[in-house]
């Protein structure tokens, strides 16, 4: 990122932080015109993908019980509610925002490894929460954290905690020697099966047919996942949201590209 872009982004964040503090002090007299604007992507530029095997400086809990969710979901800080929907590699947060309207009482988490993109989503959520503070859908149930799901997913979630997991337009890693870095592999699927409850659903969507075939094959071959048919996909509201709400999906649509969807149910563990 250029120094000029970085300084503009920093100035933008400082301006919005000042506006947020001012709005808190003047809350009783706040007007619709004083509501914060959504952040602008051009101040948060970053590469399209990040190497998951790099030694990123990441914070993660020792175990799920050590995770302080109240910092991300202040409205639920004194409740027993837990995250039940995870968007792995959430990008700019479009899917979470779409899901928040459909599941306003369900805690939804986006995990994103890229620094600038995570900061953008953080600011976007803050702005949405303040803009819709008194609305039925107030976006208090969505949050984002910077994390590497390929390494630390079990540090965040208990066994069987999640009911839905989304993998939207993941890095295709075209070169064969890079396939080990794909987000869907046999080893990783076992971890996803661990945090996904029985009858939970794993959703995938991509515009790369070769990657779609790869993901379907690995999920088909895994004993704890069973593919849901096209009729189920047609009637599932989350598929519709996933198909049209992500920024990458909208880009594919503008370019008249294809989208390949596959959804799998988490089946019961085999009897020992």
UniProtKB/Swiss-Prot annotation:
Q: Region entry Disordered: which residue ranges? A: 1-43
Q: Which reaction does it catalyse?
A: guanosine(46) in tRNA + S-adenosyl-L-methionine = N(7)-methylguanosine(46) in tRNA + S-adenosyl-L-homocysteine
One Gene Ontology cellular component annotation held by this UniProt entry? tRNA (m7G46) methyltransferase complex
Residues binding S-adenosyl-L-methionine are: 89, 112-113, 148-149, 168, 246-248
Q: Which GO terms describe its molecular function?
A: tRNA (guanine(46)-N7)-methyltransferase activity; tRNA binding
Q: Which UniProt keywords apply?
A: Methyltransferase, Nucleus, RNA-binding, S-adenosyl-L-methionine, Transferase, tRNA processing, tRNA-binding
The kind of enzyme this is, by top-level EC class, is transferase
| Composition-biased stretches (Basic and acidic residues) | 1-20
Q: Quaternary structure per UniProt? A: Forms a complex with TRM82.
The family note in this entry says: Belongs to the class I-like SAM-binding methyltransferase superfamily. TrmB family.
Q: Which HAMAP family match?
A: tRNA_methyltr_TrmB_euk
- Could you tell me what this protein is called? tRNA (guanine-N(7)-)-methyltransferase
Naturally occurring in which organism (per UniProt): Meyerozyma guilliermondii (strain ATCC 6260 / CBS 566 / DSM 6381 / JCM 1539 / NBRC 10279 / NRRL Y-324)
Q: What is the lineage of its organism?
A: Eukaryota, Fungi, Dikarya, Ascomycota, Saccharomycotina
Identify the coding gene: TRM8
């Amino acid at each position: 990122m250029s120094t000029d872009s970085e300084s503009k982004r920093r100035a933008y964040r400082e301006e919005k932080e000042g506006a947020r503090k001012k709005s808190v002090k003047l809350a009783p007299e706040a007007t619709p015109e004083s509501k914060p604007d959504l952040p602008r992507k051009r101040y948060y530029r970053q590469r399209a993908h990040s190497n998951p095997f790099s030694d990123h400086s990441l914070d993660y809990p020792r175990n799920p019980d050590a995770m302080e969710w109240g910092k991300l979901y202040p409205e639920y800080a004194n409740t027993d509610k837990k995250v039940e929907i995870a968007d792995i590699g959430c990008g700019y947060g479009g899917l979470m925002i779409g899901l928040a309207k459909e599941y306003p009482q369900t805690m939804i988490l986006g995990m994103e490894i890229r620094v600038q993109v995570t900061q953008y989503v953080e600011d976007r959520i803050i702005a949405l929460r303040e803009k819709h503070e008194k609305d039925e859908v107030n976006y208090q149930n969505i949050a984002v954290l910077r994390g590497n799901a390929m390494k630390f997913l079990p540090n965040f979630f208990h066994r069987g905690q999640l009911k839905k997991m989304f993998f939207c337009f993941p890095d295709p890693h075209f070169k064969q020697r890079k396939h080990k870095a794909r987000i869907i592999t046999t080893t990783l699927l076992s971890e996803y099966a661990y945090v996904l409850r029985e009858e939970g659903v794993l959703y995938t969507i991509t515009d790369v047919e070769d990657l779609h075939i790869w993901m379907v094959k690995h999920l088909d071959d895994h004993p704890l996942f069973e593919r849901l048919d096209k009729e189920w996909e047609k009637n599932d509201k989350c598929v519709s949201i996933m198909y049209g709400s992500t920024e990458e999906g909208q880009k594919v649509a503008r370019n008249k590209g294809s989208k390949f969807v596959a959804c799998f149910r988490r089946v019961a563990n085999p009897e020992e």
